[in-house]
Design a protein with these regions (language model features):
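N-terminal juxtamembrane cytosolic/stromal segments of multi-pass membrane proteins
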Residues: 1-27
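Structural signature of hydrophobic alpha-helical transmembrane segments
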Residues: 52-56, 126-141, 188-189
Length: 216
């Protein structure tokens, strides 16, 4: 029984070690900054270019993240294989996140359409009468981000994910409600900086193995 508990604790520590490189922090910080830049509402109104640029920014952040994992983390830690319980948690997390991502996408599209198409804007005003429509959309967007990121942090044992979830929720609210990208940009930088510090420390603590060690 003790050995079983010890193995679970070792696996948990090994799973958490995948976050010690700080790359997830950098990735989420970049996502927040791209949101702040490309969701800023211009005076002349939104265009589909805003959406295209935002999606391109997300893809760039993901490519940088995967590339850094492959070129920096994998050569130093190797490929880690986890047990069935941990794999089941990852599958559950993927399903839950898939649902929340779909909700986020729907909210994002609905919000953009409301700004682009007057008829849909009127529909939003009917659903949220008065001057509270923007406040309601902003709160819903922030709540979806906060809940989805918190669920992700729980199932992945990513402890820093809890405060990142809170910061990203605040950033989304400020983006939608105040339309001042400087505040979410600052929040994105606040998320990225600890990630860079962790990445530098990770590289120093885990130098690349020499060619002799690889042959052994």
């Amino acid at each position: 029984m003790t050995n079983s508990i010890d193995l679970k604790q070792l696996e948990k520590r090994a799973f958490r070690s995948t976050y010690q490189d700080g790359l997830w922090d950098i990735y989420y910080g970049l996502i927040t900054m791209f949101l702040a830049i490309f969701m800023d509402r211009p005076e002349e109104g939104y265009s589909w270019v805003n959406i295209a640029l935002m999606v391109a920014g997300f893809l760039l952040a993901y490519v940088l993240f995967r590339g850094a994992k492959k070129l920096i983390t994998l050569p130093r830690l190797g490929q880690v294989t986890f047990g069935p319980i941990r794999k089941a948690r990852k599958r559950t997390m993927s399903i839950i996140l898939g649902v929340f991502i779909a909700l986020q996408a729907l909210l994002l599209v609905f919000t953009f359409l409301g700004w682009l198409i007057p008829q849909i804007g009127k529909l939003i005003s009917q659903i949220f009468p008065g001057s509270n429509d923007l406040l309601a959309v902003s709160l819903i967007g922030a709540m979806i981000i906060c809940v989805s990121m918190t669920v992700s942090a729980h199932y992945s044992d990513f402890l820093r994910g809890y405060y990142i979830a809170l910061l990203m929720a605040v950033a989304v609210f400020l983006i939608l409600f105040l339309d001042r990208p400087i505040y979410p940009l600052i929040i994105g930088v606040v998320i990225v900086i600890p990630g860079i510090v962790l990445l530098v420390r990770f590289i120093r603590q885990h130098p690349l193995p020499s060619s002799e060690e690889n042959h052994e």
